[in-house]
C-alpha cells in the first residue's frame, strides 16, 4: 500500500512487481548502458545542492571489492573440462596484506586475495554523499580510475579543492594531475618518498607538513565507513549478477540508496535503522 500511495495508484490498481523492475533495468542497460544511472546519481547530488546541503572542499577517493557470484572451485573444474568461465569479467585481485612470522621468527608479508570486481568511488567529506563512481575487474589498480572520478566531480561544479586517498593513489602522475588542475594534494605518501635521500625528498616532506594534507589524512576513514554500510546493510560485499556492467548497475543503485538515506538524515534528521534488503 505505501508503494501504491507513493506512485499515485488506486487501491484496486496493480502495483509493479519484481518482474517489472527487472524489465526496466534490462531496457535501460540495452538502450544507454549505464548513462541513465550515472545521470541519476548526479541528479541526486544536484538536488542536494539545491536543497541547501553543504558540500565541503575535501573529496575522499577509495575502492572496495565485491566477491563474484561464482563458486570458484566448481568454475575451475568447468574450465579444466574446456568450458568457459561463469563470469569472464571477474578476476583475482589483492584484498590486502598482513604481517606474519615464519618458523624462524622472521617477519613476512602475506597477501589476501579475492575473486570479483571493484567499485571506485569519490565521496564528499562534509556531506557524506557519493558524487561519482566507476567499476572495474578485481585486478585493476586503484590509481587507474582516480582522474576519471576527479573529472566527474569537477564537471558537476562541486566546490572541491582537495583530494585524499590511501597509498594506492601515491602515483607521480596523479600528484602532477592534481597540481595541473589547481587542486590540493592529500594523497597518502608511501614511506619511501621521505626516507630516501634525493633532491625530491624536501618536496614530499613539505607536502606532508601542509594543512591540507594533514586534514585529508585525518578524514580519509569516512569513505571506509561508507563502504562498510554498503556491504553490511545493502549486500555490496557480493555481486548479485554476472558481468561487469551488471555489477556496475548494482554499485550505482547501492550508491543512490546510500545518498538518499544520507539526504533524509541531513534534511529531516531521520535515521534509517536495521538491515535493508539489497536494492539491485
Regions found by a protein language model. Give the residues of each.
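Polybasic low-complexity intrinsically disordered regions
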Residues: 7-180
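Well-ordered mid-protein domain cores that form the structural environment of catalytic cofactors
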Residues: 1-2
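Membrane-interface transmembrane-helix boundary segments in multi-pass integral membrane proteins
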Residues: 244-252
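A short, flexible helix-boundary coil/loop motif
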Residues: 233, 238, 263-280
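A short, polar/proline- and glycine-enriched secondary-structure boundary/capping micro-motif
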Residues: 141-146, 197-198, 276-277
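Acidic/polar loop patches that form or flank catalytic/metal-binding clefts of enzymes
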Residues: 159-163, 186-188, 265-269
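Helix-centered, glycine/charged polyanion-binding patches within enzymatic domains
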Residues: 167-168, 172-241, 245
